[in-house]
Amino acid sequence: MTKKKAKVASNTIALNKRARHDYFIEDEIEAGLSLQGWEVKSMRAGKASIGDSYIIFKHGEAYLFGATIQPLSVASTHIVCDPTRTRKLLLNQKELASLFGKANRDGFTIVALSLYWKGPWAKVKIGLAKGKKLHDKREDIKDREWKVTKDRIMKNAQRG
């Protein structure tokens, strides 16, 4: 008998699908996160959400705001677990200066795109984003529907 292949676990913890729908993503950067122990355990259990999260700058540092990490039910009682606390992003000074300059342009913001594991470290992919207008969103939907229709036509043509 052959051995069954072990399933490879996905490294992705959470995705922000709404960001790609609501914004044009100009640039993407990988950043580390400063986390507490209970947050790491909760993220390993898949209890993280970055749906409405974005990046703010305070005192020359970047922080992830709006991300939610729900504590496990078996978490210690002597530690106060705040699921929505702001978490510091670990970036070098050159990246911070570049992001700060780009974010201060008119109409640009920085949003969290995905949260994932890279080895033993939790990373967040952040993107420099510009808001989409309603007609841009409709155009994206039309393009997506046309791609599906085109693929269906090609598949049926090959069957023939």
UniProtKB/Swiss-Prot annotation:
Specify whether DNA-binding is a keyword of the entry. Answer: no
* Cellular location(s): Cytoplasm
Keywords in UniProt for this one?
A: Cytoplasm, RNA-binding
Q: What GO terms in the biological process aspect are recorded for it? A: trans-translation
Q: Where are the transmembrane segments?
A: none
Q: Name one GO cellular component term.
A: cytosol
A Gene Ontology molecular function term for this protein is: RNA binding
UniProt xrefs under Pfam families: SmpB (PF01668)
Task: Sum up the protein's function in the record's words.
Answer: Required for rescue of stalled ribosomes mediated by trans-translation. Binds to transfer-messenger RNA (tmRNA), required for stable association of tmRNA with ribosomes. tmRNA and SmpB together mimic tRNA shape, replacing the anticodon stem-loop with SmpB. tmRNA is encoded by the ssrA gene; the 2 termini fold to resemble tRNA(Ala) and it encodes a 'tag peptide', a short internal open reading frame. During trans-translation Ala-aminoacylated tmRNA acts like a tRNA, entering the A-site of stalled ribosomes, displacing the stalled mRNA.
Q: Which family does it belong to?
A: Belongs to the SmpB family.
Q: Output the HAMAP family linked to this UniProt entry.
A: SmpB
| Protein name per UniProt | SsrA-binding protein
Taxonomic classification: Bacteria, Pseudomonadati, Pseudomonadota, Gammaproteobacteria, Pasteurellales
